[in-house]
Amino acid sequence: HLIPPLDLRDFLQAHGWTLRPEGLADRLYVLQNPGFPRRQLVFPMDPTVPDYPEAVDRVIEKLSEMTNERAQTLRNRIQTVRDDTLRLRVDAPQNGNDSLPLGFAAALVTGAQQLLKAAACTVLRPRLHHPRLALTEALQLIEKSRFGQTEPGSFILTVSCPLHALDVQGTLPFAEGSLPFVRQVTLTLKRSMTQLINAIETGALDRLIEALKQDPAPLISTNLCEAVMQLYDEGLKNAVDLSMDWSALAPIAEPDRRGQPLRLQ
C-alpha cells in the first residue's frame, strides 16, 4: 500500500519536522528536525516518479533508526495519519501472549465498539446511563471506523476513526472550543478512562460515583464501565493497555498527547 506524499509530510510535521523551502523547486519535500541535527528526510512530492516507493522506504528506515520504533509500526501510523486510532494491547503472560481464546477475541472487538459508542453518546447527550447505545451518529461512527491489522507486541487490536468522518457537533462542552466530532469522541474516551482508572488505583471509586451523579455532563457512563468489563477474561487474568494515536489534522493539548498507555488490570 503506497503512502501518499501528503500523508508522510503531515505525519512528519506533526512530530516536529519542518519543511525546508529550497526543495520545493525540485519537487522534493525536504524536512529537518532540531532534535536530530544534521539529519534530513527527503522524498518526492509526486508519487508517480519511479523511485518514490524506495524514497519513502528510506525515510521510514531513517525514522525507525532515529526513534527506535519498528519500521512497520511507523508505516502503520503514517497510513492512519488522518485518523484517531484506538489501540488495545492485551497482556496475558500465562497465555503466551501470541494468541487469544476465540470467545474473548470476539468480546474484545465488541468491547472496543462499545467504548466508542458510549463515548459518542456521551458527546451527543451526556448522562450517567444511556438507555440504548443507538444514537444515529454513534452507529455511523462505528460504520466509518476501521479494524486494523493486529500488531507485534502481544496482541494489539487497533481501531482507526477518520477524523472528518461525520460533520456533526455534540453538546458536551470542550475547553478547546470547536473540534471535529470524532476528536470529541476520542478525547472523551481518553479522558473518561483516565478518570476511571485513577479512581480505581487511588481507592476513590465511591467518591467518583457520587461526583458523577451530581455532574450535569458526566464524562463516564455505566455503558462505558460495561464496555470495560468486556476487555477482561477471568480465565486469562489479562491486563489491557489502552492508548490513542492522534491524527495530525487537529491540534491536541500536551496533557492529552503525552503519558503512558492507560492500564486496566
Label the predicted regions:
Residues R27-D84:
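Long, continuous compositionally biased terminal/linker segments
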Residues Q72-L264:
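Long, hydrophobic alpha/beta structural blocks
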Residues F11, V49-D51, A250-I252:
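Residues in flexible loops and secondary-structure boundaries
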Residues L24, N68, E151-G153:
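Glycine-centered small-residue hotspots that permit tight backbone geometry or close packing
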Residues H1-R39, M45-D46:
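N-terminal ordered "arm"
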Residues L2, V49, P53, L102-A106:
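Generic detection of long, well-ordered alpha-helical segments
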